[in-house]
Amino acid sequence: MTSLISVKRLNKSFPGVRALHEVQFELMAGEVHALMGENGAGKSTLMKILAGVYTRDSGEILYDGQPVEFLSPRDAQAVGVGIIHQELQLMNHLTVAQNIFIGREPRGRLGLLLDEDRLNAQAAAILARMHVSLDPRAVVGALTVARQQMVEIAKALSFDSRVLIMDEPTSALNDAEIAELFRIIRELKSRGVGIVYISHKMDELKQIADRVTVMRDGEYVATVAARDTSVEAIIGMMVGRTLTDIAPSHSVADQGEIALEVRNLNAGPLVRDVSFALRKGEILGFAGLMGAGRTEVARAVFGADPVESGEIVVNGARATIRTPSDAVAHGIGYLSEDRKRFGLATGMDVESNIVMSNLRKFLSLNFFLRRAQIRRTASHFISLLGIRTPSATQAVRLLSGGNQQKIVIAKWLERDCDVLFFDEPTRGIDVGAKNEIYKLLRSLAGEGKAVVMISSELPEILRMSDRVIVMCEGRITGELSAAEATQERIMHLATRRETLKTAA
């Protein structure tokens, strides 16, 4: 195979942070090369340098054997390097074709009017090459995330990309959508396109990757054949340490007092007659397929979505919760599945994010901020949760996903919430950070906190939950103890309503 990209002794630093040190990487034509590492390992920085988002400090990049310097994404696109970010870069109000050729739309003879027929025809041709059935005239905002991702791939291919960088491409996809994405990746691979595949999902490696390069703490560790290397070996290279397993402790949960009881809750089409109890010291797992209503239940209890009927009882007393402020006043915290949108102020620093939900506590004379007290509080939680940051004044956006998630947790711990909803707490974070989050959740339960964990990863649900509640199409279809819960039983309950509907 021909070498498309070769990186040698690459270095990159930001203020106070050494992001890359003497990194090497090679991508061959027609291969899927997985890039693995904990959050903060330097994967994203390396890919952004290859895509022209960042410039290197030193080192060498060869493209087709020739030295190159990408000063902007346009430079990278011009030679055929495309990147598909985890957060899709699309304009929802524009059509599929307009997004694919944005800024390069074909014009009429005078160059003034958009030639929509030619635009749609060119977009259709690219989609046909991918064997994707998608109307070029469809508005992107009306598409599923999976279909939007196909638009991003088509957009990259419109530049005749020979190198395609995919950052966590399956994070928001279901199994059928992942299978379709893999089909397209294999099609591109057969045409000689080199694909850099960044993911934290180990099970995907054996399915799609040819080789794996592992990074740790901004440095190159190893490149291995995916087929010949065990998942355990890759994890060991990623973290540089042995991950201790976290076993549920069921005795406390069985004996704990009821902290939260939800009775016959109705809130929109995805919360229908939902009832459950949550005990102090317990981790209650919520499982189900996408669209089952798990997030909607959490949002309704937290006051983020309106409740039509039902009761919410906190510590034995009926609670009136119409807004998130009401929920917080009753000691309920909610960590959203979209931490960047709903959990963090990414333009602010670490200490401001930690105290922001309880800012009144840090006011003097209801006006002046007690900066020293804020600094002490932030330092306490940075130490308690093991948040890796150069300082409490570091901008949150510069931290890894795992550390950002810990900051959101710190925010609710500072409010001293007794009931905590964790919605997809490990989404988009690496295996080492996941293990730290697991330890933290178990520690919180050990202190008597009542924890709800919503997760789409069944191994995570089975590993962490004292009990498992399963939902399908807005209703609870079953409850399993930790001893009873298996992937097969959970999936049976998660598809029960679909099965009944099909049988009918």
Swiss-Prot record:
Its EC number is 7.5.2.11, 7.5.2.7. It comes from the Bacteria. It catalyses: D-ribose(out) + ATP + H2O = D-ribose(in) + ADP + phosphate + H(+); D-galactose(out) + ATP + H2O = D-galactose(in) + ADP + phosphate + H(+). Keywords: ATP-binding, Cell inner membrane, Cell membrane, Membrane, Nucleotide-binding, Repeat, Sugar transport, Translocase, Transport. It is a peripheral membrane protein. GO terms for cellular component: plasma membrane. Gene3D superfamilies: P-loop containing nucleotide triphosphate hydrolases (3.40.50.300). SMART domains: AAA (SM00382). Residues 5-242, 241-498 form the ABC transporter domain. ATP binds at G37, E38, N39, G40, A41, G42, K43, S44. Coiled coil: none annotated. One of its GO terms (molecular function) is ABC-type D-ribose transporter activity. Part of an ABC transporter complex involved in carbohydrate import. Could be involved in ribose, galactose and/or methyl galactoside import. Responsible for energy coupling to the transport system. PANTHER family: CARBOHYDRATE TRANSPORT ATP-BINDING PROTEIN MG119-RELATED, D-ALLOSE IMPORT ATP-BINDING PROTEIN ALSA-RELATED. This is Putative ribose/galactose/methyl galactoside import ATP-binding protein.
